[in-house]
């Protein structure tokens, strides 16, 4: 490699900027173990997304300290004016005043900055008063962030901040300002506004709201670097709401909004660029908040009222958990909570993990898992309690090499874990409410992906329990290749459950609970069976006979399809 190639490599990889940032951090922090310190800094560079995200002060401490009085009446000095040593042998030349340069940066060029807009180290919230609850609402352009943010603010009496609207108003009111004219051009092309400028505007807006109990911030952060900056300069949010939406739906909504509102950043070129930026930045951003246990994901492809119903349940659970429980934890029965047919709409889809929407930006981002799932043989096993579907699924799995998944068991396993999602599920069940179908679908999808490499197909027991669940499964994963309905009379199922209760001391089956479960099953299963009769291969199996007789019928049905 010659000298020119080396220089080109260093410049292209932003190596000088990285070294400058590391050196500034070392000089300011003076760590006892510089090697360990540098390792932690390099790890942060990875989290930020690479060297191009690093600035000169990325590793400079953000601690707020009382500064000594300034001499000579000067109100502002360079932050690092005294960092460089006075030793004349020090290899770097120190300037009292930097020479002019031809290139400029919106954030640092003096021609583009106003004294009043310089970022100051100040407390955004009064430390002597309770800090307001902060909810960040993120999602792709057109995912409904503004709509849902306003609904959240109205329901809980919170204040609402739209970061996009904040910047647009600033641009409109300072149209003659060179800096903001450039920012306007950046936004119009679909790029992100400069990070520090955006943070400054948010801080100034927050300081105008000293008495709010809560604040909903829409459209920020857009990447991990912005998230880190928000936490460093403002606070750690109490909750992050992620509105997951397919690319196609986002495009449709943006085109419709462009016709109705005429926003400058909704032009076709800008829309494509914004979607690309979102797709690149969303996965690491979601992962970052997942690791902190702060994020909850919602399917935003649905009606806005359905989405908000799910969000409000999650906010109640996360931020206002001290509500009177409807049942003791020892009384929880997952199979009852999963039964449908109640008036409550369970067509929700929220979860505190973003795994579903490592494909939310388009299925390609799930690394091919979704395509592999769609190629797998999928069989739904529908039947009432006591119909024998669990027993038969076990035998079929052994014969055909299928993976047997029971929604009841998946829910029980999740409840026994210590995840944030398990706490949310338990809180919902303790209130006597139904577990949202989105959570069940997420548990199913995670289990299916985990078994992809060593299975020939999936037998899903006890799913779907309503038409909406089946529709959602078809849209998110794919339609089943076969739906089996275990046709069994109420008397037979009741007798089997009572026998099971006598054989298993832990079983809580009694005549009253059995009757209720059967009633719920019949009410919910009729439309499900009708739905699949018109849509796919549905086989009704006479489940009144012996296990061997029923198994033979099932094998015949499966062999006829596969």
From Swiss-Prot:
Region called Adenylate kinase 1, residue ranges: 133-316
Enzyme Commission number, as recorded: 2.7.4.3, 2.7.4.6
Gene Ontology CC entries for this record: cytoplasm; cytosol
Binding-site residues, ATP 1: 142-147, 257
Residue span of region NMP 2: 406-435
InterPro entries: Adenylat/UMP-CMP_kin, Adenylat_kinase_CS, AK1/5, P-loop_NTPase
Compartments where found: Cytoplasm
Entries under SUPFAM superfamilies matching the protein: Dimerization-anchoring domain of cAMP-dependent PK regulatory subunit, P-loop containing nucleoside triphosphate hydrolases
Pfam families per record: ADK
Region ranges (LID 1): 256-266
Binding site for AMP 1: 168, 191-193, 219-222, 226, 263, 274
PROSITE patterns: ADENYLATE_KINASE
UniProt GO molecular function: adenylate kinase activity; ATP binding; nucleoside diphosphate kinase activity
Region (Adenylate kinase 2), start-end ranges: 377-559
Domain of life from the UniProt record: Eukaryota
Catalytic activity: AMP + ATP = 2 ADP; a 2'-deoxyribonucleoside 5'-diphosphate + ATP = a 2'-deoxyribonucleoside 5'-triphosphate + ADP; a ribonucleoside 5'-diphosphate + ATP = a ribonucleoside 5'-triphosphate + ADP
Physiological role: Nucleoside monophosphate (NMP) kinase that catalyzes the reversible transfer of the terminal phosphate group between nucleoside triphosphates and monophosphates. Active on AMP and dAMP with ATP as a donor. When GTP is used as phosphate donor, the enzyme phosphorylates AMP, CMP, and to a small extent dCMP. Also displays broad nucleoside diphosphate kinase activity.
Protein name stated in the entry: Adenylate kinase isoenzyme 5
Species assigned in the record: Bos taurus
Lineage of the organism: Eukaryota, Metazoa, Chordata, Craniata, Vertebrata
Gene giving rise to this polypeptide: Ak5
């Amino acid at each position: 490699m010659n000298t020119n190639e080396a220089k080109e490599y260093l410049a292209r990889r932003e190596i000088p900027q990285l070294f400058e940032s590391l050196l500034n951090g070392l000089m300011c922090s003076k760590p006892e173990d510089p090697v360990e310190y540098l390792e932690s800094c390099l790890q942060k560079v990875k989290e930020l997304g690479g060297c191009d995200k690093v600035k000169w002060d990325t590793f400079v401490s953000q601690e707020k300290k009382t500064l000594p009085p300034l001499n000579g009446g000067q109100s502002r000095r360079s932050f690092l004016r005294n960092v460089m040593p006075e030793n004349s042998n020090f290899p770097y030349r120190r300037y009292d005043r930097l020479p002019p340069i031809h290139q400029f940066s919106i954030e640092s060029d003096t021609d583009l900055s106003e004294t009043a807009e310089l970022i100051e180290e100040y407390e955004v919230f009064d430390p002597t008063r309770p800090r307001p609850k902060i909810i960040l609402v993120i999602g792709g352009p057109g995912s409904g962030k503004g709509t849902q943010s306003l609904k959240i603010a109205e329901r809980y009496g919170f204040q609402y901040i739209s970061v996009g609207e904040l910047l647009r108003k600033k641009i409109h009111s300072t149209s003659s300002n060179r800096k903001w004219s450039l920012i306007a051009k950046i936004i119009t092309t679909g790029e992100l506004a400069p990070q520090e400028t955006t943070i400054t505007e948010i801080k100034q807006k927050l300081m105008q709201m000293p008495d709010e109990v809560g604040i909903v911030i829409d459209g920020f952060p857009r990447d991990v670097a912005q998230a880190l900056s928000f936490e460093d300069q403002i606070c750690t949010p109490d909750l992050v709401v992620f509105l997951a939406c397919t690319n196609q739906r986002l495009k449709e909504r943006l085109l419709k909004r462009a016709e109705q509102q005429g926003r400058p950043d909704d032009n076709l070129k800008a829309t494509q660029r914004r979607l690309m930026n979102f797709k690149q930045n969303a996965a690491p951003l979601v992962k970052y908040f997942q690791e902190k246990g702060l994020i909850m994901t919602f399917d935003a492809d649905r009606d806005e009222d359905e989405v908000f119903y799910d969000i409000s349940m999650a906010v109640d659970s996360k931020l206002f958990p001290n509500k009177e429980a409807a049942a003791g934890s020892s009384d929880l029965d997952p199979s009852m909570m999963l039964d449908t047919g109640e008036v409550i709409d369970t067509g929700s889809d929220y979860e505190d993990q973003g795994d579903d929407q490592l494909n939310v930006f388009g299925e390609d981002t799930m690394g091919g898992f979704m395509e592999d799932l769609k190629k797998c043989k999928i069989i739904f096993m529908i039947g009432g309690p006591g119909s024998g579907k669990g027993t038969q699924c076990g035998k079929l799995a052994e014969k055909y090499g299928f993976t047997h998944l029971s929604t009841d068991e998946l829910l029980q396993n999740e409840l026994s874990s210590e995840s944030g999602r398990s706490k949310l599920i338990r809180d919902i069940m303790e209130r006597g409410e139904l577990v949202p179908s989105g959570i069940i679908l997420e548990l199913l999808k995670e289990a299916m992906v985990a078994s992809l490499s060593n299975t020939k197909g999936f037998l899903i027991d006890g799913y779907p329990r309503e038409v909406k669940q089946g529709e959602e499964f078809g849209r998110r994963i794919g339609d089943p290749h076969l739906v089996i309905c275990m046709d069994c009379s109420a008397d037979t199922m009741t007798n089997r459950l009572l026998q099971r209760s006598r054989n298993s001391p832990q079983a809580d089956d009694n005549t009253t609970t059995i009757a209720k479960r059967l009633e719920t099953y019949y009410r919910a299963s009729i439309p499900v069976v009708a739905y699949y009769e018109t849509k796919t291969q549905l086989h009704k199996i006479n489940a009144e006979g012996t296990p061997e007789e029923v198994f033979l019928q099932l094998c015949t049905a499966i062999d006829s399809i596969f």
